[in-house]
A protein has these predicted regions:
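Catalytic domains of carbohydrate-active enzymes that cleave complex glycans
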Residues: 64-182
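Catalytic-core regions of glycoside hydrolase
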Residues: 1-63
Length: 182
């Protein structure tokens, strides 16, 4: 569907918000961390142009008084029932410094994964254009095939080690291609 719309010049975005619930991966507190990270691999596989998050520091519902907010009052992570943590990826510190959540750090890892994948795809194009390393083309294309990791939008690996291994293999392949292209 996305590719068809993109042929008309449209950009396709995913939005992770209160509506995206199990079995779809999302950024809620009670979901496994791989669900936060796999979305970027899916975006590459399904040719999605962007992932939109409506908020990272939506700390609404708190009184204006200085001592009426967290950490002086209990934190209410249930601002959106059924979507725990939606809009909360940064948390306010006592000194008003924002603190990163583990989820935000996993999301960052997913963004970095996407960058590695993107770089490898671009290196593959260079390799083909230069007509070098023909034996590397198939291996590179195989690394960019995520069918063993993602079979649908709701069926994907639950094992983070598979993503770690694939990312490492992608990084090594980038280095190998760079040596060939020099």
């Amino acid at each position: 569907w996305a590719v068809k719309r993109q042929k008309y010049g449209e950009k396709i975005w995913w939005c992770d918000n209160i509506g995206s619930k199990y079995p779809y991966p999302n950024w809620y507190i009670d979901e496994p961390a791989i669900n936060h990270r796999i979305q970027f691999w899916m975006a590459f596989k399904y040719k999605i142009d962007a992932i939109f998050s409506w908020g990272a520091n939506v700390w609404g519902g708190y009184k204006a008084g200085e001592n009426d907010k967290w950490p002086y009052q209990p934190w209410n992570a249930m601002t959106y029932p059924g979507a725990n943590g939606d809009g909360y990826q940064l948390y306010p510190g006592i000194d008003k410094t924002p603190y990163s959540s583990i989820r935000l750090e996993v999301i960052r890892d997913g963004i970095e994964d996407y960058e590695y994948i993107y770089i490898l795809r671009e290196k593959l194009k260079e390799l083909k254009k230069a007509r070098k390393g023909e034996n590397m083309v198939a291996a590179t294309e195989s690394l960019l095939d995520f069918s063993s990791l993602i079979t649908s939008l709701v069926k994907f690996t639950a094992n983070p080690e598979e993503l770690f291994r694939r990312r490492e293999m992608i990084a090594l392949q980038i280095e190998k291609i760079d040596k060939i292209l020099k």
